[in-house]
Amino acid sequence: MRGVLPPGATIGLHPHETNSEVIYILSGTGQVLCDGVYEPLGPGACHYCPKGHAHSLQNTGPLPLEFFAVVPEEP
């Protein structure tokens, strides 16, 4: 899934109880919060949220944050 967050926008903290998620940053800057740790993200960065964990994504820059997310479903 491709997503775009405007400056200051966030995808709030949410759990991944039955799957994991990989986020790849295409453009812009932001930060992810995972397991209580903030991680800065920019173009080319990748974030992995394992199954059973929670995370959030926030655009901290002046431009849109464009990303690609993969959420594999387990059978």
Kindly label every feature range from the protein language model.
Residues 18-30:
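Glycine- and acidic-residue-biased ligand/ion/polar-headgroup-sensing regions
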